[in-house]
């Protein structure tokens, strides 16, 4: 890998940048309706185990036991997991082609910095063939930390071993981008492929 310009590392988010979110409120609403579950009741039970699941301190089955299978159901956890996976699809004007172009340049270390459970993260990487384009996957399920907490950005910087100002971070959520900026990274808030390409061209990445 030959270094180029002012940056050494390009980090992408996944949900909202390349694919739909793995298990956010929109995806949850679809699956809850499919299984005829009360959304308010689910959401009241969901948040605490969800945080632990994304940090990989509990399994998907532990999460579902806490949020759904605390009483008998007419469907199985595996039925529910299959429906969860079906929600992961590419978004319009996504950044997958940008990821591939940056990786093909062989000038940068290319990776992810995302919040996702191990189950959905690894499914999404395999399903959409993203792994060959990545040098590093800094997912919440591997680091035990979540965006926008400052500690996940600091840990990412330590792992990457380069100054924060030589890292570009791309995320669709302003709060996550702002948190990266606060740790010294160059953050880009993603709104679409054309916008991202234009900004990376200005930075002489593409």
Placement of each model-derived feature along the sequence:
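Asp-based, Mg2+/Mn2+-dependent phosphohydrolase catalytic module
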Residues: 1-7, 117-206
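Active-site neighborhood of HAD-like aspartate-dependent phosphohydrolases
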Residues: 2-45
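Short, acidic loop-to-helix structural element flanking the phosphoryl-transfer center
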Residues: 5, 78-110, 122, 150, ...
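Generic structural signal for small/hydrophobic residues in well-ordered secondary structure
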Residues: 13-16, 56, 102, 112, ...
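Alpha-helical elements of Rossmann-like donor-binding domains used by nucleotide-donor carbohydrate transfer enzymes
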Residues: 26-30, 48, 62, 66, ...
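Short, surface-exposed acidic
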Residues: 35-46, 72-82, 205-206
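Metal-dependent phosphoesterase signature
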Residues: 50-96
């Amino acid at each position: 890998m030959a270094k180029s310009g002012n940056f050494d590392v390009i980090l992408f988010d996944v949900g909202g940048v390349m694919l739909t979110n793995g298990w956010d409120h929109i995806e949850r609403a679809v699956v809850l309706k499919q299984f005829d579950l009360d959304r308010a009741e689910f959401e009241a039970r969901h948040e605490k185990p969800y945080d632990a699941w994304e940090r990989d301190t509990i399994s998907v089955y532990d999460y579902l036991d806490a949020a759904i299978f605390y009483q008998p159901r007419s469907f199985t956890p595996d039925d529910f997991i299959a429906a969860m996976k079906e929600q992961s699809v590419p978004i319009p004007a996504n950044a997958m082609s940008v990821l591939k172009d940056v990786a093909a340049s062989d000038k940068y270390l290319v990776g992810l910095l995302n919040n996702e459970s191990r189950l959905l993260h690894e499914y999404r990487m395999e399903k959409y063939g993203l792994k060959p384009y990545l040098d590093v996957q800094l997912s919440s399920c591997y680091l035990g930390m979540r965006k926008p907490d400052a500690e996940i950005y600091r840990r990412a910087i330590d792992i990457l071993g380069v100054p924060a100002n030589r890292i570009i971070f791309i995320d669709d959520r302003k709060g996550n981008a702002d948190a990266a900026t606060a740790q010294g990274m160059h953050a880009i808030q993603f709104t679409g492929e054309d916008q991202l390409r234009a900004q990376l061209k200005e930075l002489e990445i593409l």
